[in-house]
């Protein structure tokens, strides 16, 4: 009896440990893949949020009124980004499904439609932010002493919101293709250029005129 049972138990235990070891390795590989995907997305999102924060910090050396006005406008700008991200969420889901099924033609179609939709929505938002800057800021409770700075910043940054819409769509498409590192690197470069542009245009360095709030807006928009 023992001669029959012991080999059976030995084989069963060996299979169990082999299966458990394989499962643990698969889980570790999955964790590493998730980390490689999530880390660039987290960094990219953080850097996008830093664009407005950098403007606020650098403007604090120029004017207190500018800081207060830009802080209010940045809240509105971040809300518009949420609108774009709703469309991009659907883009990511569809692209991931089609890429998994190797339907590359459909992926191109989804990205194209998303770019068109976000471009149309972005143009509408740009027109709204540019044309209705004053009533929107009054609705947000911005005081008269801050109104001009707020309007200048909002009109310049808002007028080019559709560029950000297209950029976010392309980023979502690349993330769904497991290429999240490329949008992150682009965002790093954008932040560096924004800091240099702010320093040049806010304070009038390197031969540029001193533009204050308008300089920060131009640097952020472009």
What are these regions (language model features)?
Residues 118, 173-200, 217:
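Alpha-helical transmembrane segments of multi-pass membrane transporters/permeases
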Residues 41, 45, 56-57, 93, ...:
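Transmembrane alpha-helix boundary and packing residues in multipass membrane permease domains
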Residues 1-41, 95-162, 193-196, 208-222:
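Short alpha-helical transmembrane segments in multi-pass integral membrane proteins
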Residues 45-53, 126, 130, 191:
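Recurrent gating helices in multi-pass secondary carriers
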Residues 56, 67-127, 164-176, 180-183:
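Small-residue-rich hydrophobic transmembrane alpha-helices
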Residues 59-78, 144-149, 213-218:
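Interfacial/gating helices of multi-pass transporter permease domains
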Residues 31-50, 54, 76-83, 159, ...:
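Residue-level signal for short hydrophobic patches within transmembrane helices
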Residues 50-53, 61-64, 98-101, 176-177, ...:
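Helix-loop interface residues and adjacent transmembrane-helix termini in multi-pass membrane transporters
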